[in-house]
UniProtKB/Swiss-Prot annotation:
Keywords: Clathrin-mediated endocytosis of virus by host, Disulfide bond, Fusion of virus membrane with host endosomal membrane, Fusion of virus membrane with host membrane, Glycoprotein, Host membrane, Host-virus interaction, Lipoprotein, Membrane, Palmitate, Signal, Transmembrane, Transmembrane helix, Viral attachment to host cell, Viral envelope protein, Viral penetration into host cytoplasm, Virion, Virus endocytosis by host, Virus entry into host cell
Intravirion compartment spans: 514-531
Signal peptide start and end residues: 1-21
Cell compartments where the protein resides: Virion membrane; Host membrane
Record protein name field: Glycoprotein
Gene: G
Amino acid sequence: MAPQTISLLWAMVCVSVYTRANRVVAPIHEPQNWKPATVDDFTCRTGFNLDFDSKFIKTKALVLKRVGQAKVKGYLCMKNRWTTTCETNWLYSKSVSHHITHVAVSAEECYNKIRDDASGNLKIESYPNPQCAWSSTVSREEDFIHISTSDVGYDMYTDTVLSPSFPGGTCKLKTCCKTIYPNIVWVPETPAQTQVRDALFDETMVTVTVEAKKVVKDSWVTGATITPSVMEGSCKKTLGSKSGILLPNGQWFSIVETGQITIQPKGSVEEKETWVNLINDLNLSDCAETQEAKVPTAEFTVYKTESMVFNILNYHLCLETVAKARSGKNLTRLDLARLAPEIPGVAHVYQLTSDGVRVGSTRYEIIAWKPTMGLDKTLGLTIVPSGNRNSETIKWIEWTRTDDGLLNGPNGIFIADGKEIVHPNLKMVSFELETYLISEHSTQLVPHPVIHSISDEIYPENYTIGGKNSYIKIHTPTAYFWSGIHWIEGAVQKLFIVVVATALIGLFILVVWLCCGCCSKSRPVRNQKWE
């Protein structure tokens, strides 16, 4: 890896420090096929952002842009029947009465009223006038509909609208909802599902890796607003009437395209399959009711950029370790930690012994790093969605002792002083760099993103890992005695501009003066006689 690239990566890392929980990819059980490691056993497995050879699908999906209740615009719609009754006797004595009756109203009648009001076709409300007849009772009635705006809440988990006017306070989302009043219903202003989609969801592109034409537990999903996540531990959850997948990290997405989806290796079309068939192979269970979806925070962009930088940086550090092994140099525990994979799945595990390094194959998962000492040394707990199954304790039984007296576990993990389980690369893999950089490196960072004082070549100096005197110099700025004192720097810059401008003006005046002098000498004097 070029020194310039290393420096640039470290600069990006230092600028985007973001502390997360200690979640690492670790082996969940010990292999049964240990063997002495040879040079060919030291390999690097690329992370999701680097694995360009893997097959994947890109498709449109809905993702949450907000959680909790949304607002659905609508109307309360009421229908009344106005009746006029005219009663006469044989002497033609007339009696007229009026009364109003509440009657049931349909959604169609409500929408007709909404359209009429919008078009200005207003109907004047008044009692009808019946034609009275001798010695008879005649009635005439006319129906009038009233509408008034009424926005209601919406619960995306139950797909119901919420209002005190509804019986029980809720109504399953549909074209019309009854209220506690027999003659009043609620109708949405526009199709409710459209309002819900616009309020809760954004449409984006997602990428999902596939193996053997299937989405498997080791498949990864990522997108413009989806944190890279493994599919294992996901469950099915319907939000806003949209069937989707809740990832282990709490993010939710729903595929928009239900037809054929292209499977691509390196961007070329290979074969087509439907998303339904792909995802059904996972046999996902339904999520627990208590499991809630999350929306990426404002830190998401920083985290995703940082994770990509870390994947690239870790991959190249791993390549350096492989080159070190193939050149016959001794490997350290930190080297073994760099060889560990960054994504779940089956991969090599390395363990230091008194005779060298041994290697085996095992399964890796994302775990919460919570080491505890005891008869069974615990590394941590598996990360699973709450409600699906209990977290599993990850233990490492067989620890090997080396000549330095330390007990060694998987991938460079060791027990220090018989009291503490130490991950040599934890600060790197868990993105907790701030303390690591301060304690292990002396860093020089540009206080502002300026380039005028940075030399053209960016390179690290004395780049070593470990040791009290080791450090990484991010870049080599052109230093002046006023560097770091901003008001002096500004004054010097302004003074420099004034001096240059004055010099240019003076040069211009000098040129003009010389030109004028030359012209005056060459011009003949008036009335002068030439001999």
